[in-house]
Amino acid sequence: MSSIRSAFLALFFALTLAACSTAPPAGINPVTSFDLNRYLGQWYEIARLDHSFERGMSDVNATYLLQEDGSVKVINRGYDTQRQAWKEAIGRALFIGDSNTASLKVSFFGPFYGGYHVVALDQKDYRWSLVSGPDRDYLWIPARDKQLPVDVREQLVSQARS
């Protein structure tokens, strides 16, 4: 009985780790020549693929703060329209590889991390980006302002679809 239980636990942990993938999805190439210090600060969510953890949320924004240990404190905040209350989630992000490649892993609970990959970025002013999660079902368009020029938004949506 103990060997069956051990096998079950091993399978459970293997599946859990696979579900918490931090590598970029196939075909996704994170931005290189990335400057974390320029990326820090507040970003507003312009568009997203909807998921249960953000469903019904409006005015979503994220703030990234550099910590003394080199990690990044992530503060996600949004207005829950059903409950008519603000919700906040605090997490921690770490670079997966070198700090010049915009590929990080983020955790909002315990040892479980998911990928955060900047795949397009306004390299000149860091005003907008396109972010992929652990797979192509998780995509966001954050920007420094609450609105993006229509042509920029359309370009990012087109890139996200390709």
Where are the regions a protein language model picked out?
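Bacterial N-terminal signal peptides
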Residues: 9-18
